[in-house]
Amino acid sequence: MIQGGGLDTDLIEKPSRDPIINEADNGRSNAIGTIAMARTSDPNSASSQFFINVADNDFLNHPDKTQHGWGYAVFADVVEGMEVVNHIKSVATGSERYHRDVPSELIEITEIHISNAYDQY
């Protein structure tokens, strides 16, 4: 997976809004090309970090409403530009300060497009 949001390009935490309620029981699965909310071990802690699934990650799906069963809420799909996602996936990573898997080159999302295509689910 590729995780983003929450940190600026200097790996400093950005201000975020209050956490949201986990909606992983929405019927969506963490399949390749989906985008989901990242969170801590608290099921209702997602705020500004997200991840793009670069593989089918069924183990992240919602099996039940227990502490370990909540899963991760899928809220969007990559509908165009999966080749960009695959390029990001191929970038070498390392550790920087207390962060792991930091890309060796700056990767920054500068533009996204939101559509109502999600209404079909």
Mark where each language-model region is.
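Cyclophilin-like peptidyl-prolyl cis-trans isomerases
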Residues: 1-121
